Amino acid sequence: MTGPDGEGTGAIWAAAGPAIKTSNSETRSGKRAFISIDSCHYIAVMLKVMIAPVTPFQQNCSIVWDSETMEGTAVDPGGDFDRLKQAIDEQGIKITKVLLTHGHVDHASAAGTMAEHYGVKIEGPHKDDLFLIEGLPESGRKYNFPAYKPFVPDRWLENGDTVSLGNLSFDVVHCPGHTPGHVVFVHKPAQIAFVGDVLFRGSIGRTDFPFGNHEQLLSSIRERLWPFGDGMQFVPGHGQTSTFGWERKTNPYVADLLFDD
């Protein structure tokens, strides 16, 4: 089965990179499980991440929180709201905002419902994705998604903005190409980025959508993401985690050896 972003659906993945583990026994029963990024890897900043592949498209919703204040967010809650809520509440996380990388249905559908439930605002993506946000009800019907609450983000994000979460601060990087308003959230102290569908392990985002632009996507990755350094680990919108350095060496679309500069 192929999702709206062109990524194949499948079973829970054992994520690559340090200190990542499955957090419960659901994998053994064949159900979708959560993936945890253990805070011991980021002991100086106390950032915690739990990755939940949601909907039949297995879109990686990242639940991110400051373990000192327990203030948290969901990055790209594309669906399965009840399941996300249960995990959030079990961890004792206080959701203070919802973050969106872009406006595609598998990333944004449940954002309005989550924001209403927790009484918080939605931040992101960039305003150039407004047409996708406005089209979510129609897109949801096309892919048989539940009828989640329509919304318009409370804060559109620009390149160079920052997003706060408890004592944590994330850089906002506008990375158009997959969609015109796509943004990436980067936490430099923890060396982790939430990249949505800009970059995958061994691949890049599709650009055969309205206003997609392949050359623009390549430029976004090489000019706006690579400068954060090879050690930056990233959580993609689908599939396994990786690092910028690994993709610069091996990715068949953006490896350094493909470019003359």
Model regions and ranges:
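N-terminal helix-forming leader/targeting segments
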Residues: M1-G8
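Residue-level detector of structural "landmarks"
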Residues: A11-G17, R32-I35
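Short, Lys/Arg-enriched N-terminal segments with co-localized hydrophobic residues
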Residues: A33-V45
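Conserved beta-strand hairpin/beta-sheet module of binuclear metal-dependent hydrolase folds
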Residues: M46-Q91, V184-G196
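Short, glycine/acidic-enriched loop or turn micro-motifs at the edges of active sites
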Residues: E68-T69, G79, V105, D129, ...
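Active-site neighborhood of phospho(di)ester-bond hydrolases with catalytic His/Asp-centered motifs
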Residues: A74-V75, T96-G103, E123-H126, H174-G177, ...
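Active-site HxH/HxHxD metal-binding segment of metal-dependent hydrolases
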Residues: G79-S164, L168, K249-L257
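Metallo-beta-lactamase
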Residues: E138-S139, T162, L168-D261
